[in-house]
Amino acid sequence: NVKWYCNNAENLPFKNNEFDYYTISFGLRNIDNVDNALGEAFRVLKPGGRLLCLEFSKVKNEILNQFYKIYSKTIPKIGKFIVGKSEPYEYLINSIEEFYSQKELLELIKKNNFTNLSFRNLSGGIVAIHSAWKI
């Protein structure tokens, strides 16, 4: 069975060792203290539980990166044209640029006691899936 929750990732209202999986998609970079959130993820996972995180990342191919930077600069303009506001789209681009690289995020996950860490780039590294286990 799957149950969906929406809570403060830095202070989860769950018991220790309660979940088999902890997933988060495009949310980790919006959390004030990512380190605290990962600590909470570890706390609520059962031993043998798995963390899966899908998040924007750093493009590894230089040619693709140049196109992605140009595309990223147009997103706020398109947002302003379509919905009349550019600020949410500027926030999106800034939060992506300021977030951890794949390896930096992997190290932060490791710092929070996770093991068997890995990440997989998708779309040339525009996004990455990080995976880790609580052993």
What are these regions (language model features)?
Residues L106, K110-I135:
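Core SAM-dependent methyltransferase catalytic element
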Residues D32, K46, K134:
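Short conserved AdoMet
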Residues K58-L108, N112, S118:
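C-terminal alpha-helical "lid/dimerization" subdomain adjacent to the S-adenosyl-L-methionine
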